[in-house]
A protein has these predicted regions:
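Acidic donor-binding loop of glycosyltransferase active sites
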Residues: 277-290
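Conserved N-terminal ligand/cofactor-binding loop architecture of enzyme catalytic domains
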Residues: 21, 25-103
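Active-site and donor-binding regions of nucleotide-sugar-utilizing enzymes
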Residues: 18, 68-171, 175-178
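Short hydrophobic beta-strand element within catalytic cores of glycosyltransferases
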Residues: 282-284, 300-310
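C-terminal "capping" alpha-helix adjacent to the active site of nucleotide-linked donor transferases
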Residues: 321-324, 330-347
Length: 403
């Protein structure tokens, strides 16, 4: 049985979501693969510089920035993070090598940025026969060294720009794979069969009003308060569903506003697809996951693009504009006129039409890509072997689909 290890961390929710979604689908497919998840942050806990300096783990500090909306300082923090990773590169590689020596695998799939040079070197040193795949969970890279590095072996990207970035770095075309979008949980492909009218009524909403869903990832954002206040005093006829994630304090502050417009405020929920099925449009952060989830449910989006936008997400607003699947606002303090524009029948119909035409099946495209990679890696190992007998190129015939 072939072993696949998916490397993730919990800085932001998107990396874990991608890892768990891929594990679920890979195990459902007809491949004899054993799939394991590796939380890199736990493995690197002995050298977590942030925890040693502040008592706060790196991933917790990052998530705190998201909750507080302190994202304006992320470019400076990225410089510090890159420097720290370079400083500890040798120790990180050794910890990874130790892990691989105890938990060997045939393919390593990274769904995280920053650490891919360390991962590539540790695999080359400890498991030279293993394949190393980097799957971007962003629509584009933020060079240098964010997602793609010279040492990257195989790259899976979800946009034409990311593919061109990989090619411009000199990566061979045969090792670059473009999917139709971002990896989403399988649940986003199984839309709930519900009576929207009855469900809206049950949640205290009106069945006849345009309904927006407001989301800022798994930890919410203070920007949701600004949106609630602005929308509540706007002349636009609509209602909102707020999903606050793990930010219970934010949910309480929203409830304390006592909005005059109908609203529903939820804390953390695993029923995001259910709430999206009740909505007509999306308002939130320009994260690749949030945008892609909304589009999967046919929702045009309104996202913010300014100096507070995290560097790796700055292309996303441009992507939304180019695809004509939503509107971009410079600041949510100006959301009222943008909402008015979106709710014009002609504008909404055009955006909705473009959203419906956008098809993303990335989660179901990745298994065949990985199967191809493992087949290619096995053949390369055979071709570069010093003797014909050192590697059996057909040892994996069953998993490779060879006959």
């Amino acid at each position: 049985m072939r072993k696949v290890t998916i490397v993730f961390h919990d800085a932001g929710g998107g990396h874990r979501n991608a890892a768990e979604a891929l594990k679920t689908v890979l195990e459902e497919q007809d491949y004899p693969w054993q799939v394991k998840l590796l939380n890199l942050q736990e493995l690197l806990a002995p050298i977590d510089f942030a925890a040693k300096a502040t008592g706060l783990r790196f991933q917790d500090g990052y998530n705190l920035l998201l909750r507080k909306g302190w994202t304006r300082i992320t470019p400076q923090l990225l410089v510090l993070l890159r420097y720290t990773i370079r400083l500890h590169h040798g120790r990180i590689v050794r910890l990874l090598q130790k892990h691989w020596s105890e938990h060997s695998t045939h393919l390593v799939l990274s769904v995280i940025p920053h650490f891919n040079r360390c991962l590539a070197e540790s695999i080359r040193k400890e498991m030279p026969g293993a394949a190393f795949v980097t799957l971007l969970t962003d629509l584009a890279d933020y060079p240098p060294g964010f997602w793609m590095v010279r040492e990257s072996e195989y790259i899976v990207c979800g946009s034409e720009l990311a593919k061109q970035q990989a090619l411009s770095m000199g990566h061979p075309r045969r090792r670059i794979f473009e999917t139709s979008g971002m990896v989403l949980k399988p649940s986003f492909y199984r839309k709930p069969e519900i009576d929207r009218r009855q469900e809206r009524l049950r949640l205290g909403l009106r069945p006849d009003l345009p309904t927006g869903i407001v989301m800022f990832g798994g930890h919410g954002s203070a920007a949701m308060l600004e949106i609630a206040k602005r929308v509540d005093r706007s002349p636009n006829r609509l209602q909102l569903i707020f999903l606050c994630g793990h930010n219970a304090a934010l949910a309480e502050k929203l409830r304390a506003l006592h909005m005059t417009k109908p609203s529903r405020i939820e804390g953390f929920t695993s029923e995001v697809p259910y709430f999206m099925s009740l909505a007509d449009f999306f308002i939130g952060k320009p994260g690749p996951g949030s945008i892609s989830e909304a589009l999967q449910f046919g929702l045009p989006v309104i996202v913010e693009q300014n100096s507070r936008t995290m560097p790796q997400e700055r292309y996303n607003g441009k992507w939304v504009t180019e695809k004509r699947v939503g509107l971009v606002v410079p600041d949510f303090s100006g959301i009222e006129p943008v909402l008015g524009q979106m709710l014009k029948p002609s504008t909404f119909e055009e955006l909705r039409r473009n959203v419906v035409h956008y098809k993303n099946h990335a989660i179901y495209e990745v298994p065949s890509i990985l199967d191809h990679v493992m087949t290619s890696k096995a053949m390369e190992s055979w071709q570069t072997s010093s003797t014909w007998n050192s590697v059996d190129p057909f040892a994996g015939a069953a998993w490779a689909g060879l006959t």
